[in-house]
Amino acid sequence: MTKDAARLVLVVEDDVSVRRPLVKFLEMHGFAVVTAETADEGLEMVRKHRLVAAVVDLRLRRGSGRDVVVSTPNEVPVIIFSGVPSESAELERLRPRTRLIEKPYSLVLLVETLEEMLSESQNLHS
């Protein structure tokens, strides 16, 4: 059964010490969150849920976040967080509605960027 939420965000991050505070912060800001630790789990979540956005770490222990980014529907905003900006630069050029936030990142900046991208989405569909 899919999680039905107006503001459902996928977080793909294999490091629990990064994932846990990110999920809590997103929930505090009114988002429902589904998580994945591997690229395969992330791909399953993309297929299974109606997402408003995805936050994806490119470097995972098992698989590449890149697979999740390119498999996410183009209308869904994706925030990539990475410690290696050159990795995500190509994805930002190739996939619409993709932004990079470099590690270490601010949770406040991440949520502000997410809200901005969602606002842009609503304006496109108005």
Question: What annotation goes with each model-predicted range?
Answer:
Residues 10, 35-53:
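Acidic, metal-coordinating helix/loop segments flanking the phosphotransfer/catalytic sites
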Residues 13:
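Conserved acidic carboxylate
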Residues 16, 37-41, 108:
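Acidic phosphotransfer microenvironment of two-component signaling modules
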Residues 16-34:
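Two-component/phosphorelay signaling modules centered on CheY-like receiver
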Residues 23, 101, 105-125:
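C-terminal output helix
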Residues 57-72, 85:
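Conserved phosphotransfer microenvironments
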Residues 65, 93-101:
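As written
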Residues 81-82:
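Hydrophobic/aromatic residues positioned on beta-strands within the core alpha/beta folds
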